[in-house]
Amino acid sequence: MENKIKIAVVGCGHISSKHFSSIEKHHNKLKLICICDSNKDKLLLMKKKFKVKTYSNLNEMLKNEKLDLVVLCTPSGIHADQTVLCAKHGVNIIVE
């Protein structure tokens, strides 16, 4: 039975690379489930690199995935709304 923390990363900008490398480094305890970003070109690159599901809509991702943790690597101006949405879905959150 796999008992890893299931993670989604939201936002594929510069800071997300630090989180992706940490997830890879601790692959025995963490599992990247999906990635969300509004930029479809970035999503395509990330899908090829990490071979996980991708979403362009946070709400859709939260409805469709069973996650333990969401890492928000998005612009600070939208953190509050995204944090509340994740909390309403019962997901733990790291806000960059």
State what each model feature region is.
Residues M1-K49:
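N-terminal Rossmann-like dinucleotide-binding module
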Residues V52-E96:
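Beta-loop-alpha module in the N-terminal Rossmann-like domain of NAD(P)-dependent dehydrogenases
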